[in-house]
Structure formats: C-alpha cells, structure tokens
C-alpha cells in the first residue's frame, strides 16, 4: 500500500507582484478627505477618536424621540402622503415595465412578428409598424490592459474566496462526520453489549427507526407487558440512555412486614442497589424489577378484593391480612430509599426471617403464574363463546395465608398436646403423642409433563394437612387429629377432623368437622379425661402403664357421670365417696368428697362439708407431689 499523503484543500495565497498603484490611493484620499492641505495628523487622530466614541444607536434614538413628539394629526397626514407615494411608485414601475415590454416586442417583431404582436400594447401598434426597429451586433472597443488585469485580479480573488469557503465546509463536514462515526460506534457497541447479556433488542412497534430493549415479562398482564419495552436512545456522545416511559425514576419494591401485638417485629430486606448505577445494565435491571414489583402489588390488590370475607383489607397503598389473633401481615409498595415513619419503625427482628420468606414466596408465585399463562397460551384455544372470558386472580395471597394459618394452628395444637402431656407426666401417667406437621407436602413428588420447579410450587397450592396421634393411658385407647387448611376452594379456613378409638365408650363420636380452637381443645381434653376415668376404674388389682397398685381394703371406683368427670365408690360400712376429676391444658385436679348415701333420684347425696382430699397437678409439678395412682390408692382406703 502506498504511503499516505496530505492534500491541502485551501488554495495557496501568493503575494502580489506589485502593490496597488499610487494614483489610485491618492484618488481615494481626495474623495474621502478632500485636498491634502486640509489633512493633518491631528485631524486624522480626532476623526479616529470620534469614530470610536460614536454611539451607533444615537441617530435611531433621535429619530424615535422626534417621531414620538408628533401628534396624531401629523402622523395621519404623513401616513396618507406615504401611501400616495407608494402608489405613485408602483404606477411608475408598472409604466416603465410596460415601456420595456413594448421595446422588446417591437425589437423582436423584425424576426418573429406574430409572437411579438401578442405582447405589444394597442398604442404601440398604432404608432409603429411591425419590424420598424432592428438591432445589430457592434464590436465593443478594446479594453485597456490595466482594466483586463484588474478584472483578472478580481476574478482570481473571487475564486480564492470560494475555494476557502469550500475548504472550510469540507473540513467542518469531516470533523462532524468523524464525531458522528465515533458516536455511532459507541452506540452500537453498547447495543451489542446489551444483546450479548441476554436482553432482547428489537425495533419499536410505533417507532420503526428506533431500537428498544424488552426487559418486561411477555406473560404478564397487558398493561405491564406493554410497559416492559423501552427505547434505547442515543445521546450526543453516543452513550445509551433508557427511555423508560411510564416507569418511575426511582426503584420500587413490595415490602412485607409482620406486626405482633401492635409492634412491627419483622420487615423484609430491600434488594441491595448495584454498585454501578449509571450503567445501562443496572438501569435495565432497575426498570425490570420495578415493573415486576408493580405488577406483583397490582395482583395482590386484585386478589385481596375477593378475600374480604377472610379478613383481608386494603386501604390506599396497603394490603393487610391476619395470621392469628395477635399477629398480622402488612404488604405495601414503597420506593427503595423510602424512610419509614416513626409509628412503623421495626421494634425487633423476631419475625424478620418470616417476612423475608413471605417476600420471596409471593415473587415465586407470580413467576409460577407467568409460567401457567405461557402453558395455557401454547395449548389449543378453547371454543369461541359470546361471553367474555374473565382473567382469574393469581394465587399469591391465598397460599401464603393458608401456610401461615395452618402453621399457627399446628403450633397451637402442639402446644396444647405438650401441655397436656406435661400435666400427665407430673401425675405419673405416660402418654405417647406423635406430631407430623405438613404431612400432605411431598417435596420429592414428580408430576409427568411438569418441570420440577413447577411441581414443587404446585405442592404449596394444594390444601395443607397435618396429623397428630396419641396413645392414651389405657390400652387400645387412642385418638387422631387431622388439621386441614384450604383457602382456595370451599370449605375455606382451617378445620380439625378428630377420630377416637375408645372401647370403653364406643358410642362417643366427635363432630365431623371442628372450626374453632376452643372447641377442639375442649373435645381433646374431654377424651383424655374419659381415658383417665377409665384408668382409675381399672386401677384396683391391675397395672396401668407399668404401675402396680395395692389390692388390700381398697374401694372400687365406678363411673357415675363420666362426661362430668364424676366417679362413685360404694362402701359396705356406709362411708361412700365421690370423686370429681377435671382436666384442662393448665392443670389436672382430683377432688374426693364423702357422701351419706343415694337420694331418691339415684344421685349421691354429698355432705355439705368441704372435700376430704384434693390434689392438683400442673405442668411444672413439684418433686414431693404424689402421682395420680398413689393418690387414688390413698383415698380409696376404707
């Protein structure tokens, strides 16, 4: 390749062969200042100073002041005079134009009389015949050499000036083109970098000459799907800017808080901001996250409107639903840098993990809803009907509410059974309680045709079930409790299904479905109480859970009113006794009374004296406290 070389665009300027002639300069001085006798150095300096200090607006101001002093009448007369002058000038110009037209027409009538006659005036046709005027070419007199040289110099000057102008324009265009090339190169490099990172770049639907990046989710609702496309604009230096359109400038996020007993005890963590917030990648990610968070809160509000019967409330920018009597969850859409007011300050981080888990759960459920939309869209469409198909609300709040409510009921039931078990242990009775929380969940279950992620999420959309079982004091006595929570299909809420196996009371059957915790607690404690009464009636001469009882001179207890916890012991000496047994989650109490006999209604007549003996067992039993069977053996003596 040949070496590069510089090609100058501007013409080379040459010095004049000789200066301007002196007679020309003298003529210019005489025309400007007059005779040389009147031109002195002082007069020239005074003229220069006067030109420097002269105000260019002075004459205009004088004219304005003079015109302002004229009255209205003079201005009106002046207006009419100027109008007449303008009209006269127009008529004179028209007349001169007609004279010129007649002259040219008469001159052309020598050669083309028919065409020239059409442009002649009527007066000229009368006074001058056609072809009476002719023209000849006369050679001009030869110009002197000085005039030809001056014309040549002027032409050369004009050419030099035009060359300089063209060179300046070419250099400016080259500079502008170089800057434009650098700007375009930087723009396309950044566009290519955006595409290489996995973002979809395409033309805008309504602006075909511009490029856009698709950062939204195609399976979102139409209002948020259309907002997921932003234009990639180019600045003057070629860098990319993201035209977000309706997307807010600040990042927004859905905040989850847990309120317990009126205090905020947990708050979800905001997503940490990127280190390089000015990069196009961080701006695209911020726009994507903001659209996703706004769609998430929009769907939460839509779902909350149909869950009003389950305690879900919405007000302004807040969604609130209860978990238990003392705990509730708050969800709101805030700016990432928003500062919480004083009444919403987090008092502790007791439930911070729960808040973070809920925040992740609702986002995963929204992504699962997007996948379900894609699955429905790829399947065969349903037949067309005149009725418009409604878009169902996404299941975002309902699975979360079901999990929290079910977990709350499971913890309550575990606490109840543990308390009863501790009371029985303090009374010397051993029972086996077994708990299987969330027994319905099978994380290893696979569904044909579904990815593992969707199959895993689908497990949490089904009703939750937990199973509790217990082997009671007497052999073959047991109960089983199934806790079931469902917030998607009826029956809604949490229900307890209790099944009992008590051979001593075969007719005792619990209700099919129990919805209140107090009712479930009373039924379970009642069944345990019946089993304790059965153990007391079989205590003489037998062993209960490995405990040997004394057999000499002991009364035999019989269940008089077992559902009221009353036992009766009849003695041959007439010293009858009555036992009252009561059980709650806090204590087990046994009271023994002496009775005179049986009244006419078959009921024992209790003495009005206080109880002979009384014993209470609690969760934190004392070491010197006798167990239940020892106490029964002692009060059974005649």
Curated annotation (Swiss-Prot):
Kindly report the protein's main subcellular placement as a broad class.
nucleus
Q: Which gene encodes it?
A: srb4
Cellular component terms, GO, for this chain's entry?
core mediator complex; mediator complex
Query: What biological function has been recorded for the protein in this entry?
Result: Component of the Mediator complex, a coactivator involved in the regulated transcription of nearly all RNA polymerase II-dependent genes. Mediator functions as a bridge to convey information from gene-specific regulatory proteins to the basal RNA polymerase II transcription machinery. Mediator is recruited to promoters by direct interactions with regulatory proteins and serves as a scaffold for the assembly of a functional preinitiation complex with RNA polymerase II and the general transcription factors.
The listed locations are: Nucleus
Q: Could you give the subunit structure recorded for this chain?
A: Component of the Mediator complex.
Q: Where is this region: Disordered?
A: 1-21
- Per the UniProt record, the source organism is Aspergillus oryzae (strain ATCC 42149 / RIB 40) (Yellow koji mold)
Could you tell me the keywords of this UniProt record? Activator, Nucleus, Transcription, Transcription regulation
Q: Which family does it belong to?
A: Belongs to the Mediator complex subunit 17 family.
- InterPro entries, sorted: Mediator_Med17 (IPR019313)
GO molecular function term, any single one: transcription coregulator activity
One Pfam family recorded for the sequence = Med17
* Protein's name according to its UniProt entry: Mediator of RNA polymerase II transcription subunit 17
For this entry, list what GO says about its biological process.
regulation of transcription by RNA polymerase II
**UniProt keyword Nucleus present:** yes
């Amino acid at each position: 390749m040949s070496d590069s070389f510089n090609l100058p665009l501007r013409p080379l300027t040459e010095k004049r062969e000789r200066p301007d002639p002196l007679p020309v300069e003298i003529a210019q001085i005489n025309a400007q200042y007059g005779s040389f006798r009147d031109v002195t150095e002082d007069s020239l300096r005074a003229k220069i100073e006067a030109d420097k200090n002269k105000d260019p607006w002075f004459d205009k101001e004088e004219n304005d002041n003079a015109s302002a002093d004229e009255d209205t009448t003079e201005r009106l007369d002046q207006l009419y005079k100027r109008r007449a002058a303008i009209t006269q000038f127009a008529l004179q110009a028209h007349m001169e134009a007609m004279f010129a037209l007649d002259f040219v027409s008469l001159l052309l009538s020598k050669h083309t009389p028919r065409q020239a006659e059409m442009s002649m005036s009527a007066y000229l046709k009368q006074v001058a015949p056609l072809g009476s005027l002719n023209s000849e070419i006369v050679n001009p007199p030869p110009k002197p050499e000085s005039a030809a040289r001056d014309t040549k110099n002027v032409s050369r000057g004009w050419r030099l000036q035009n060359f300089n102008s063209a060179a300046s324009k070419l250099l400016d265009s080259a500079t502008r083109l170089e800057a434009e090339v650098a700007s375009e190169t930087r723009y396309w490099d950044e566009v290519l970098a955006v595409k290489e990172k996995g973002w979809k770049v395409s033309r805008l639907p309504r602006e075909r000459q511009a490029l856009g990046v698709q950062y939204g989710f195609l399976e979102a609702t139409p209002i948020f799907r259309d907002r997921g496309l932003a234009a990639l604009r180019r600045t003057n230096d070629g860098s990319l800017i993201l035209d977000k359109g309706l997307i807010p400038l600040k990042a927004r996020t859905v905040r989850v808080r847990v309120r317990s007993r009126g205090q905020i005890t947990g708050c979800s963590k905001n997503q940490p901001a990127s280190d390089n917030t000015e990069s196009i990648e961080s701006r695209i990610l911020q726009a994507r996250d903001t659209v996703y968070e706004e769609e998430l809160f929009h769907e939460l509000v839509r779902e909350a409107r149909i869950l009003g019967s389950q305690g879900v409330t919405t007000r302004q920018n807040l969604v609130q639903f209860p978990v238990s009597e003392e705990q509730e969850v708050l969800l709101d859409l805030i700016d990432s840098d928003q500062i919480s007011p004083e009444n919403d300050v987090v008092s502790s981080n007791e439930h911070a993990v729960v808040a973070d888990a809920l925040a992740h759960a609702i986002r995963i459920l929204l992504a699962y809803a997007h996948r379900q939309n894609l699955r429905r869209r790829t399947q065969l469409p349903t037949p067309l009907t005149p009725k418009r198909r409604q878009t169902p609300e996404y299941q975002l709040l309902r699975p979360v509410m079901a999990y929290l409510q079910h977990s709350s009921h499971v913890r309550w039931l575990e606490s109840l059974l543990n308390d009863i078990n501790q009371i029985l242990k303090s009374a010397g009775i051993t029972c086996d309680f077994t708990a299987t929380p969330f027994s319905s969940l099978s994380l290893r279950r696979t569904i044909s045709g579904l990815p593992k992620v969707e199959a895993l999420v689908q497990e949490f959309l089904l009703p939750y079930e937990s199973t509790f079982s217990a082997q009671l004091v007497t052999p073959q006595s047991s109960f089983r409790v199934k806790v079931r929570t469902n917030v998607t299909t009826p029956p809604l809420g949490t229900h307890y299904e209790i099944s009992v196996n008590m051979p001593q009371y075969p007719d005792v059957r619990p209700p099919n479905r129990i919805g209140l915790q107090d009712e479930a607690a009373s039924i379970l404690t009642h069944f345990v109480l019946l089993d304790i009464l059965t153990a007391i009636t079989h205590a003489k001469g037998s062993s209960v859970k490995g405990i040997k009882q004394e057999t000499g001179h002991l009364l035999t207890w019989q269940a008089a009113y077992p559902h009221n916890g009353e036992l009766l012991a009849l003695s041959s000496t007439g010293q009858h006794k009555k036992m009252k047994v009561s059980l709650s989650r806090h204590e087990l109490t046994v009271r023994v009374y002496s009775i005179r006999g049986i009244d006419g209604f078959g009921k024992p007549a209790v003495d009005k004296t206080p109880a002979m003996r009384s014993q209470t067992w609690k969760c934190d039993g004392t070491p010197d406290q006798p167990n239940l069977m020892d106490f029964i053996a002692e009060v059974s003596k005649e």
